[in-house]
A protein has these predicted regions:
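Signature for phosphate-centric chemistry
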Residues: 21-139, 148-240
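Bacterial Sec-dependent N-terminal signal peptides
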Residues: 1-22
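N-terminal helix-rich structural modules
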Residues: 143-145
Length: 240
């Protein structure tokens, strides 16, 4: 019996420990990958096969943590809580929180956050720590980004960190619309797949709305509001 109790206790401890992490990971594209303060040597480097030495790295990365994609998304959410008379007590509390979030986000829609910069700086530190011979003095680094502001700034955070680590690198850094054809390429097959598999989410926002609004019929796009609120709250971890 003691053994069973111990196993149950251990299981509960593990579950509670994972709960906070899993909630963050549920943010999907807004999940903020952790950044460590070390030089990157905490994770083991991939070893080259016997008789070979690393001489080249090709890195294709997404932009770092960002704000929600457009200011209009913040404004739209805030507008849904404009009618105080239709808000429940919880709805009034949420309105106050949403207002503070939107004020803080004003003018930042789609932009890279400070955490996003740190994530790409950390990638550069790990690369340099694991493969210093590739980034020796006089070696060349060629970097390209899409025309998106957050992507260009992610690239600059990465290359600037490399420059700090090895000032004698030859950096070729550019953002050019001419490169978009291969940076953001979508094959005809992928486009067809997206069209074929696009389905409307079968999720009811009824319970969600009833917690916030007295008359839910006044909300024109209930599913959109629920998903946008999910995106709003998930994105908060990107601005810590």
């Amino acid at each position: 019996m003691k053994k069973v109790s111990y196993l149950i206790y251990l299981w509960l401890v593990c579950c509670l420990g994972l709960q906070a992490q899993s909630r963050r990971e549920m943010g999907g594209i807004y999940y903020a990958y952790p950044v460590t303060d070390d030089a990157g040597t905490d994770s083991p480097a991939v070893k080259a096969p016997a008789g070979f030495s690393p001489y080249y790295i090709s890195h294709y990365g997404r932009h770092g943590s960002r704000w929600m994609s457009r200011d209009e998304r913040y404004l739209w959410i805030e507008k849904q809580f404009a009618d105080d008379g239709n808000l429940t007590p919880l709805g009034l509390q949420i309105k106050s929180i949403v207002k503070r979030i939107c004020e803080n986000a004003k003018g930042n829609g789609g932009k890279l956050t400070r955490l996003g910069e740190q994530q790409h700086q950390a990638i550069a530190r790990r690369m340099y720590a694991h493969y210093p011979q590739i980034f020796a003095a006089g070696h060349q680094v060629k970097a390209r980004s899409s025309v998106s502001d957050r992507c260009a700034k992610s690239m600059l955070a990465f290359t600037s960190q490399l420059r700090n680590l090895q000032p004698q690198l030859h950096l070729d850094v550019k953002t050019d619309s001419a490169d978009m054809a291969w940076i953001a390429y979508e094959s005809p097959e992928l486009k067809a797949l997206k069209k074929r598999t696009k389905v409307k989410a079968q999720v009811s926002p009824r319970r969600f709305l009833q917690q916030l609004f007295k008359n839910t019929a006044k909300i024109d796009e209930p599913l959109k509001l629920m998903t946008e609120m999910y995106g709003l709250t998930s994105s908060l971890q990107d601005n810590q």
